[in-house]
Swiss-Prot record:
GO terms for molecular function: ATP binding; homoserine kinase activity. It comes from Buchnera aphidicola subsp. Cinara cedri (strain Cc). The keyword Transmembrane does not apply. This is Homoserine kinase. GO terms for biological process: threonine biosynthetic process. Its EC number is 2.7.1.39. It catalyses: L-homoserine + ATP = O-phospho-L-homoserine + ADP + H(+). It holds the Pfam family GHMP_kinases_C. It is found in: Cytoplasm.
Length: 315
């Protein structure tokens, strides 16, 4: 049996709409990511387990894992009957790369099971294509960091789709999912089709300065330019508690606060564990809509997707 784990990810990272993404892992070692197990079978089987498996479609052909299996068969020019078990640890429509986590884990597991030895670039293209089935267009800001780890800059160059960027390892990332879902397509459709030239220039300046600050190790400069002027202003109405939460946790000492991906998860960057714990406590009391919501203090997951032991230990 082959078992693969793929971590949660933050798309956009505030300043990089559709071109930045970062993989994360809770410091308490909670598995914030999906797992895929594959073994031989006389007929195709797909079993769903995990805390959020009930969110998955009842019709097997609507499940992204079934679509991944069909698409991979076509690309690999092989067809094998397998039993796939999806451990769904990520809520759908959370803004944490839930679909990317399932897709990445499944594609890697299939590649290993079939022994096709497809290159990382070819695998990434398959992942992006499958992600596009869900969101409506191919994009890599979740699948790339989920697969490769760290902070990824999406170039969309077909020979070199993504580049890994340096990131401050002492930052702590507090993520809070309120327990409700927000459709990625809905969050994308609310955005304008065109932006003013002034806005485009402003955003280009922010992104360029942020990346420059990463390479020159100027953390304060990076934080100042880690702003979202492309999506956040339009998505705020979809996330009623976001603005008040952002104001409060910055008062508590967080360095910044932004929407994770399409939302409704928010993320904040904290300079130390003391402030991160204060932010976590406040968000748990004030940002949650129900008991299924969660808050985690995270660090960067530099490894990305990887094999797992039988006892859910990450290799």
């Amino acid at each position: 049996m082959i078992k693969i784990y793929a971590p949660a990810s933050i798309g956009n990272v505030g300043v990089g709409f559709d071109i930045l993404g970062i993989a994360i892992k809770p410091i308490d070692k909670t598995l914030l990511g999906d797992c895929i197990s594959i073994k031989p079978s006389k007929k195709f089987q797909l079993k769903n387990h995990g805390n959020f498996s009930k969110q998955l479609p009842v019709n097997i052909k609507e499940n992204i894992i079934w679509k991944a299996w069909k698409y991979f068969n076509k690309k690999a020019k092989k067809k094998k009957t397998v039993k796939i078990v999806l451990e769904k640890n990520m809520p759908i429509g959370s803004g944490l790369g839930s679909s990317a986590s399932s897709i990445v884990a499944c594609v890697i597991a299939l590649n290993k099971f079939y022994k096709t030895k497809l290159s990382k670039t070819k695998l990434l293209k398959i992942m992006g294509k499958l992600e596009g089935i869900i969101s409506g267009e191919v994009h890599y800001d979740n699948v790339a960091p989920c697969y490769l780890g760290g902070l990824q800059l999406i170039t969309n160059d077909q020979k070199n789709i993504t580049q890994k960027l340096p990131i401050f390892t002492d930052w702590l990332w507090v993520i809070a999912w309120p327990g409700v879902t927000l459709s990625t397509s809905q969050a994308r459709n609310i955005l304008p089709l065109k932006y003013k030239k002034k806005t485009c220039i402003h955003n280009s300046r922010n992104l360029a300065t942020f990346i420059h600050a990463l390479y020159t190790k100027q953390s304060e400069l990076a934080i100042r330019y880690m702003k979202d002027i492309i999506a956040e202003p339009y998505r705020i109405p979809l996330i009623p508690k976001f603005l008040i939460s952002k104001k409060k946790i910055i008062e508590l000492g967080a360095l910044t606060c932004n929407i994770s991906g399409s939302g409704p998860t928010l993320f904040s960057v904290c300079p130390n564990i003391s402030i991160a714990k204060k932010v976590k406590i406040w968000l748990k009391k004030n940002y949650m809509e129900n008991q299924t919501g969660f808050v985690h203090i995270c660090k960067i997951d530099q490894s990305g997707a990887r094999k797992m032991e039988k006892k859910n230990e990450i290799i």
